[in-house]
Design a protein with these regions (language model features):
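Nucleotidyltransferase catalytic core that binds NTPs
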Residues: 1-97
Length: 97
């Protein structure tokens, strides 16, 4: 199975410094709702003491955790250091916590 960019997709955005069981649980919840997941990794390496991992390491760790069980069900995007999410009215998707 291959990730389908035209299929309904859930989006999760974070630093994942480091990726852990709670992130995986959120991924699994989003997957059960949306069918596939886009994981947006904010590139925050070195901005604070809480961001020690280079983005390449973060992405590698996420793949190591998910690939065996969820190949084709997710994609990972490198993002800039997003500090806010803004949207217009009637954009065609929900914003949930």
């Amino acid at each position: 199975m291959q990730f389908n960019p035209k299929a309904p997709t859930g989006l999760m955005v974070g630093r994942y410094q480091p990726w852990h069981r709670g992130h995986r649980a959120l991924f699994e919840k989003i997957l059960s709702i949306a069918g596939q997941v886009c994981i947006g990794v904010r590139d925050t390496h070195g901005t604070t003491e809480k961001d020690p991992l280079p983005i390449e390491d973060v992405i590698s760790r996420i793949h190591e955790d998910l690939e065996q069980d969820y190949a084709g069900k997710y994609t990972i995007w490198q993002l800039p250091n997003i500090s806010g999410v803004y949207y217009g009215r009637d954009v065609g998707y929900k914003v949930e916590q």
